[in-house]
Amino acid sequence: MRHQLRIPLLSKPADQRKALLRGLTTQLIREGRVTTTKARAKALRNETERMISLAKEGTLAARRRAIGYIYDKKLVHSLFEKAQERYGDRNGGYTRIVRTVARKGDNAQMAIIELV
């Protein structure tokens, strides 16, 4: 029995879940918006906001942690350059989740997650 479940399991083993969230985080930072299921969007929000907070911090250690998580190294450098001017006065809430219509095949609740 899992009390106080802090991360959604997304019906995947831990390694697949981590790879999925890393890929979605990389895509969201690159594209600015991603269409996915509502549960994945909510899990993705935590990881993306953590990466943007690291970018706002701007230290070498924070940059190395972000490089270890985000798949594209050039994307990390551009994130660290733009994060302070884009999110400098904002304390969290860097993403927005907008619900959309259900997916046709399996009626899953879909959502668009985008950077504010």
Swiss-Prot record:
Q: Which InterPro entries match?
A: Ribosomal_bL17 (IPR000456), Ribosomal_bL17_sf (IPR036373)
- Which positions, given as ranges, span the membrane? none
List the GO biological process terms: translation
Q: Which domain of life is it from?
A: Bacteria
Q: Which Gene3D superfamilies match?
A: Ribosomal protein L17
GO CC annotation: what is one?
A: cytosolic large ribosomal subunit
A GO MF term: structural constituent of ribosome
Enumerate the UniProt keywords alphabetically. Ribonucleoprotein, Ribosomal protein
Q: Does the keyword Transport apply?
A: no
Self-association or partners: how does it assemble? Part of the 50S ribosomal subunit. Contacts protein L32.
The entry sums up its family as follows: Belongs to the bacterial ribosomal protein bL17 family.
User: This chain belongs to which protein, by name?
Assistant: Large ribosomal subunit protein bL17
Identify the coding gene.
rplQ
